[in-house]
Curated annotation (Swiss-Prot):
Protein name (record): Photosystem II reaction center protein J
Transmembrane segments: 10-30
Biological process according to GO: photosynthesis
Keyword rRNA processing: no
Superkingdom, natural source: Eukaryota
GO cellular component, one term: chloroplast thylakoid membrane
Subunit structure: PSII is composed of 1 copy each of membrane proteins PsbA, PsbB, PsbC, PsbD, PsbE, PsbF, PsbH, PsbI, PsbJ, PsbK, PsbL, PsbM, PsbT, PsbX, PsbY, PsbZ, Psb30/Ycf12, at least 3 peripheral proteins of the oxygen-evolving complex and a large number of cofactors. It forms dimeric complexes.
Keywords attached to this entry: Chloroplast, Membrane, Photosynthesis, Photosystem II, Plastid, Reaction center, Thylakoid, Transmembrane, Transmembrane helix
Subcellular location(s) of the protein: Plastid, Chloroplast thylakoid membrane
HAMAP family in the record: PSII_PsbJ (MF_01305)
Role of this protein: One of the components of the core complex of photosystem II (PSII). PSII is a light-driven water:plastoquinone oxidoreductase that uses light energy to abstract electrons from H(2)O, generating O(2) and a proton gradient subsequently used for ATP formation. It consists of a core antenna complex that captures photons, and an electron transfer chain that converts photonic excitation into a charge separation.
Protein's organism: Chlorokybus atmophyticus
Chief location of this protein within or outside the cell: plastid
Entry annotated with the keyword Amino-acid biosynthesis: no
Length: 42
């Protein structure tokens, strides 16, 4: 269970960071769309 043998595998912290940023971006877009009255374009 060492970090040196993770060749070919994506680090968990990188996955968590990208997923967290994607969720925050999606929530921001949805909230901004519903606030501006443009959220009904779905």
């Amino acid at each position: 269970m060492s970090n040196t043998g993770t060749t070919g595998r994506i680090p968990l912290w990188l996955v968590a960071t990208v997923a967290g940023l994607a969720v925050i971006a999606l929530l921001g877009v949805f909230f901004y769309g519903s606030y501006s009255g443009l959220g009904s374009s779905l």
